Amino acid sequence: MNKGPTVAGQAVYSKKVLSIYDFWVLGVSNNFFWKCPTRNISEQFLMLVTSNHLDVGIGSGYYLKYYLSQSTKRIALLDLNQNSLDATSKAINHFQPEVYCGDVLEPLELNVDRFDSISVNYLLHCLPGNLID
């Protein structure tokens, strides 16, 4: 597989971009482009997240930072972008997250217990190809 497009899709998430990510994505993009307010996504996240959760394509980690129950037993992060992993793992350090750097389009050889819930918020638009592919 050509890794170039996958790497390009995540490369935009620099520390500088992550500093305005929540404002742009959650405040502007969700409301005006996708017509799906962040509060709707937050409500769905709250309904579906479990205390044994894997978040894939974590972005800024917004939903993890603000909507994880304090009783969460296990949280794991999977992303190709180290900036996102560093920022989010630091922000939710009190949960002692498992952190995995990897490409979702490549086989992942993680020798870990299963998760009860997995979220992929804002991941699909970063993957190479188009809807027909």
Residue ranges and their predicted role:
Residues 121-125:
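Residues lining the SAM
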Residues 127-133:
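A short, conserved alpha-helix within the catalytic core of class I
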